[in-house]
């Protein structure tokens, strides 16, 4: 019973469509009708600016962290935190409060890892920032960090680096989260191939792509 309640709570927590609600309540803008139409951090930054984007990022990360820590907070030591965190990501991606159309799972996945394996998250965040600096594309940075997450969760425990031992629940969760992130970035991958992906005005833009107009 406790497990079901925790799963439900995590899903509902993840379902809070941060960017969408910030847009509606503070800016009177429906994010679905602007930019990429996505309700996640990237589109919020692009359409509503730095303050709204930063708030969305932090709240979306916090949703994942809080959900992951729920079993600890209620004293359910027999329930795996990573499993509960996973349901927050599902909520974020398929939110009941926003017609089951949510974000691309990146920020909330980061939040889950922050609650479960913070040093490992720091490593993946470094991969993300480095890729972002080199190519100026948030989508490519998210995809690269996801692929590196899968490779590293399978190899790091063998080298006792950042992940001390194999944790099959963490491994499965990382693989599934990476798959969700990659699937949610199908349109971005097409645009990266066509060299028409949205760039941010930071970094080296190594692919020498011309800044695209907003899609």
UniProtKB/Swiss-Prot annotation:
- Which GO cellular component term is one of those annotated? plasma membrane
Coiled-coil annotated spans: none
Q: Any idea of its EC number? A: 2.3.1.275
UniProt keyword terms in alphabetical order: Cell membrane, Lipid biosynthesis, Lipid metabolism, Membrane, Phospholipid biosynthesis, Phospholipid metabolism, Transferase, Transmembrane, Transmembrane helix
Its subunit composition reads:
Probably interacts with PlsX.
Q: Which reaction does it catalyse?
A: an acyl phosphate + sn-glycerol 3-phosphate = a 1-acyl-sn-glycero-3-phosphate + phosphate
**InterPro entries named in the record:** G3P_acylTferase_PlsY
- Name of the protein in its database record: Glycerol-3-phosphate acyltransferase
> GO biological process: any one?
phospholipid biosynthetic process
Q: Briefly, what is this protein's role?
A: Catalyzes the transfer of an acyl group from acyl-phosphate (acyl-PO(4)) to glycerol-3-phosphate (G3P) to form lysophosphatidic acid (LPA). This enzyme utilizes acyl-phosphate as fatty acyl donor, but not acyl-CoA or acyl-ACP.
Q: Where does this polypeptide localize?
A: Cell membrane
Question: Transmembrane stretches, by residue range?
Answer: 3-23, 42-61, 68-90, 110-130, 134-154, 162-182
Tell me the pathway: Lipid metabolism; phospholipid metabolism
For this chain, the family text in UniProt reads: Belongs to the PlsY family.
NCBIfam families registered for this protein in UniProt: glycerol-3-phosphate 1-O-acyltransferase PlsY (TIGR00023)
KW Transferase (keyword) present: yes
